[in-house]
C-alpha cells in the first residue's frame, strides 16, 4: 500500500519538501495493525517536548540557545496516568500554554483511557514518550535513528504495544 507522506502536512510545508532536493532514503514503511482495535494496546509519542516535572530533566534548552541550529535528540518517558501539575514543556518552537493547561493537547492520555474503558481500544500502555521535535536546520536525525528511536522501540515492545499514535507539536 502506497502511503502519501504529505497527506496530513500543511500545504506550505508540503510544498517546501516537494520542491526540495531531499528525498526519502527508503519507502515509508507501512505495517497494518495485526489485531482489531478493541484488542490492541496503544502508546502515545509526541514531538511536543513534554517531560515529567520533578522526575526527569527538561530538554536541553540552554544548548539550543547557544547553538540555534541544534535540537536535543533525547526522549522523555511520560507515565500515562500523569498528574497535570507534573507536566512540563521545554520546546522553544511552540506555545506551551495549551499543554501546560491540559496535557491532552499534545498527548491525549485521558481520551485514550476513556477509549479503553469504553472498549474501543484494548488498552493504553503505562508509558508514553516525548521528543523535542525541532532537530536543527538542516535537521540532524542521526541521534533519533541510531540511538533514541531504537531505545523507545525496545520499550514499546517490552510493554507489548501494538500501535502508536504520534502527535506533533
Where in the sequence are the language-model features?
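Metallocofactor- and cofactor-centric catalytic cores in central/energy metabolism, strongly enriched
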Residues: 1-169
Amino acid at each position: 500500500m502506497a502511503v502519501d507522506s504529505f497527506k496530513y502536512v500543511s500545504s506550505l510545508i508540503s510544498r517546501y519538501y516537494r520542491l526540495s532536493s531531499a528525498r526519502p532514503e527508503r519507502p515509508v514503511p507501512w505495517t497494518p495493525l495485526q489485531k482489531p482495535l478493541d484488542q490492541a494496546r496503544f502508546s502515545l509519542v509526541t514531538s511536543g517536548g513534554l517531560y515529567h516535572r520533578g522526575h526527569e530533566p527538561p530538554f536541553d534548552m540552554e544548548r539550543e540557545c547557544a547553538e540555534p541550529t541544534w535540537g536535543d535528540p533525547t526522549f522523555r518517558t511520560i507515565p500515562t496516568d500523569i498528574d497535570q501539575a507534573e507536566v512540563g514543556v521545554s520546546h522553544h518552537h511552540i506555545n506551551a500554554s495549551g499543554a501546560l493547561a491540559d496535557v491532552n493537547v499534545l498527548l491525549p492520555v485521558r481520551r485514550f483511557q476513556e477509549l479503553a474503558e469504553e472498549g474501543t481500544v484494548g488498552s493504553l500502555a503505562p508509558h508514553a514518550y516525548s521528543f523535542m521535535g525541532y532537530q536543527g536546520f538542516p535537521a540532524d536525525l542521526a541521534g533519533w535513528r541510531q540511538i533514541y528511536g531504537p531505545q523507545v522501540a525496545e520499550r514499546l515492545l517490552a510493554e507489548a504495544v501494538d500501535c502508536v499514535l504520534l502527535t506533533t507539536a
